[in-house]
Amino acid sequence: MSNKNFPLIFERSKEGRTSYSLPELDVESFDLEAELGSEYVRQTPPELPEVSELDIIRHYTGLSNRNYGVDSGFYPLGSCTMKYNPKINEDIARLDGFSHIHPYQDVSTVQGAMAMMFDLQESLKEITGMHEVSLQSAAGAQGEWTALMMIRAFHESRGDYGRTKVIVPDSAHGTNPASAAVAGFEAVTVKSNQEGLVDLDDLRQVVGEDTAALMLTNPNTLGLFEKDILTMAEIVHEAGGKLYYDGANLNAIMGYVRPGDMGFDAVHLNLHKTFTGPHGGGGPGSGPVGVSEELAAFLPKPLIVKKNDGYDFDENRPQSIGRVKPFYGNFGINLRAYTYIRTMGAEGLKKVSEYAVLNANYMMRQLEDVFELPYPQHCKHEFVLSGSKQKKLGVRTLDMAKRLLDFGYHPPTIYFPLNVEEGLMVEPTETESKETLDGFIDTMRTIAKEVEENPEIVQEAPHQTIVKRMDETRAARKPVLRYHP
């Protein structure tokens, strides 16, 4: 059944209709205005919809039918690792011992949850090669900021207040320079070379006595492994700086190489990406931070520790940067990640990376004759095509991304990283079959042919979606954020 004419919840409203019934008021009414003052009390009631329970159910069911997620179809959003989230994660998360507890409970009454979090810390230490891990950060960007605050605290503990700059590659995630700025640093860009990797000569030029850290993703955002990482670590460390690992692309290297073994001093992980917490809807996420022994004293407190009589919170950490989130992280996402790690095991996680890399390289080689491939070497978990060939024919990458919607696919990430013209960043992940990959490849080839033979159909896409071509510029500059009857 089509829901193209799906009404807004306000349009379902009819005065006097309700979805509830309450008994007669048997207590004294409370005069808010007299108690709080008129400036804190609405003079007119809010314009809320008046609907029945059935209206509400149909409204949200209709919205869910319009939604698109990993369970709906292929979701090759580059640098987001939109893999399938095993449903056993949800089964475990719904166990009473996890779902019916409260963070204010005495630690002695939640020893099972404490054991899980401690074991997760230990697993992440092993996976990353870090000395200690905190689960507190809520998501990736906060994990970046947390790591940078620890690096800042480390330098200041040594009286080294002149380290005011953080180096960020030109292919980095936008959150990297943003996190550096929020942490009080100046972001400095290091260029990529012709291979799409960090230019070592330029790195040597920008590193100095004012360098606090180099932020790096490896593989980088182009899906390419920074093969000179040991040299880069040496350059930064000789200058007195620290090397920070953005864990966005860990899905490509698990079981093969660890950030700690590459010389990184701090790392954040995206448990909602690599370790199958459901994401894409705005949260929650989880961004644990791991550090070397030299930085461990500065981790957010408390840490979970194992004692002879059970598990406890360690609050006695005088050099800690303090809490970065209430309680102890996003427990539900941490639990799902723990379930995934225990389900897969060490060999399973290694296979994850193998298949993620295999799928990406297969797709890249199947499409390199149709689209420009700026960096033709083997990729890791993702690759970046360029729509520059199609742009010369009057069709932009944005147009092709919208055309993909007509075929039932979520588009790849577009126009990122910024150092690729008309970029299309594709990350298939390990959970997709060859048949799914082939279907997407055929669709991309079909769209490329349309660009040559019938460009208007691509330029005016999408045609089959409930909402057609939107004016993104107007939406960004003049958003309508509330209902006006």
From Swiss-Prot:
InterPro entries: GcvPB, GDC-P_C, GDC-P_N, GDC_P, PyrdxlP-dep_Trfase, PyrdxlP-dep_Trfase_major, PyrdxlP-dep_Trfase_small. This is Probable glycine dehydrogenase (decarboxylating) subunit 2. PANTHER family: GLYCINE DEHYDROGENASE (DECARBOXYLATING), MITOCHONDRIAL, GLYCINE DEHYDROGENASE, DECARBOXYLATING. Its cofactor is pyridoxal 5'-phosphate. It is an enzyme of class 1 (oxidoreductase). The modification N6-(pyridoxal phosphate)lysine is found at K273. Keywords: Oxidoreductase, Pyridoxal phosphate. It catalyses: N(6)-[(R)-lipoyl]-L-lysyl-[glycine-cleavage complex H protein] + glycine + H(+) = N(6)-[(R)-S(8)-aminomethyldihydrolipoyl]-L-lysyl-[glycine-cleavage complex H protein] + CO2. The keyword Oxidoreductase applies. The gene is gcvPB. Its EC number is 1.4.4.2. One of its GO terms (molecular function) is glycine binding. The glycine cleavage system is composed of four proteins: P, T, L and H. In this organism, the P 'protein' is a heterodimer of two subunits. GO terms for biological process: glycine decarboxylation via glycine cleavage system. The glycine cleavage system catalyzes the degradation of glycine. The P protein binds the alpha-amino group of glycine through its pyridoxal phosphate cofactor; CO(2) is released and the remaining methylamine moiety is then transferred to the lipoamide cofactor of the H protein. Belongs to the GcvP family. C-terminal subunit subfamily. The keyword Nucleus does not apply. One of its GO terms (cellular component) is glycine cleavage complex.
